[in-house]
Amino acid sequence: MANLSYWLLALFVAMWTDVGLCKKRPKPGGWNTGGSRYPGQGSPGGNRYPPQGGGTWGQPHGGGWGQPHGGGWGQPHGGGWGQPHGGGWGQGGGTHNQWNKPSKPKTNMKHMAGAAAAGAVVGGLGGYMLGSAMSRPMMHFGNDWEDRYYRENMNRYPNQVYYRPVDQYNNQNNFVHDCVNITIKQHTVTTTTKGENFTETDIKIMERVVEQMCTTQYQKESQAYYDGRRSSAVLFSSPPVILLISFLIFLMVG
C-alpha cells in the first residue's frame, strides 16, 4: 500500500508540474496581433476583406447587378439560393454553426464502475440492479405436498433478484421487502407474457424463496459496502496520500 501511494504521489506531482508550465507559456498571436482580422477591418500587413468598391454600376461591393456582396441573384452574402451567409441549404454560415453545436455528453466513468462492481443496472426500473445468478435454496414449507411441489417446479422461479444499493435503506427489512416485491413483480410479468401463469401456491412459495435470496443478497452487498468504506478510510489516512492531497490543494490555491 505504501509503495502504491508513493507512486501515485510521483505521478500527480509530474502531472501538475506539466500543467503549471503549460499555463505559464505565452500563447502565440491573439486578437489584434496582425495577420487576418475580422471582416471589414484593416490590418498593418495582413489579409483584408475583399476591397470595398471596385464593382460596376449598381454593384456596391464588387458583385453583379443586385448582388450587394458578391453573390448571385438573390444571394445577399455570397451563398447559393436560400443560403443567407454562404452555407448550404438551411445552413446559417459555414463553420459558425459548427461552433454552436452541443458537445456530446460524457459518460460518467464513476457510475459505470459502480454499476459494474455492484451488478448490472436495469434500464427502466428506476435504479434497480440485477444480482448474479444464485442456486435456488433448498427449503421446507411445513408440509410434504408443498415441499414436493417446490422441488418439481423450482426452475420456474427466479434465480436472480432485483435490488437497489444498500446505502439507500435504513435496515435489512426494508431492503428485503423492496427486493422481494420488485423481483416477483418482474418475474411474473415476464413469465405471463410468455403464456405461463402462476397459481396462488406458486406465489406463496415464490415469496419465501425470493425472500431468502434477497436476504443473501443484502448480506453480500452490506459486506462489500463495508469493505469499500474501510479500504477508502485506510487509503486516505496514509501519510503519502495526505501529503499528496495537501500538495494538490496548494497548487490549486496558488
From Swiss-Prot:
Lipid-substituted positions (GPI-anchor amidated serine): S231
Region (Interaction with ADGRG6) residue spans: 23-38
SUPFAM superfamilies documented for this protein: Prion-like (SSF54098)
Main localization category: membrane
Biological process terms in GO annotation: amyloid fibril formation; cellular response to amyloid-beta; cellular response to copper ion; cellular response to xenobiotic stimulus; intracellular signal transduction; learning or memory; negative regulation of activated T cell proliferation; negative regulation of amyloid-beta formation
Residues covered by region (Interaction with GRB2, ERI3 and SYN1): 23-231
S-S pairs: C179-C214
Residues spanning the signal sequence: 1-22
Region (Disordered): 25-106
Residues at which Cu(2+) 1 binds: H61, G62, G63
Description of how the protein assembles with itself and partners: Monomer and homodimer. Has a tendency to aggregate into amyloid fibrils containing a cross-beta spine, formed by a steric zipper of superposed beta-strands. Soluble oligomers may represent an intermediate stage on the path to fibril formation. Copper binding may promote oligomerization. Interacts with GRB2, APP, ERI3/PRNPIP and SYN1. Mislocalized cytosolically exposed PrP interacts with MGRN1; this interaction alters MGRN1 subcellular location and causes lysosomal enlargement. Interacts with APP. Interacts with KIAA1191. Interacts with ADGRG6.
Family, per entry: Belongs to the prion family.
Known role: Its primary physiological function is unclear. May play a role in neuronal development and synaptic plasticity. May be required for neuronal myelin sheath maintenance. May promote myelin homeostasis through acting as an agonist for ADGRG6 receptor. May play a role in iron uptake and iron homeostasis. Soluble oligomers are toxic to cultured neuroblastoma cells and induce apoptosis (in vitro). Association with GPC1 (via its heparan sulfate chains) targets PRNP to lipid rafts. Also provides Cu(2+) or Zn(2+) for the ascorbate-mediated GPC1 deaminase degradation of its heparan sulfate side chains.
Name used for this protein in its record: Major prion protein
Gene name of the record: PRNP
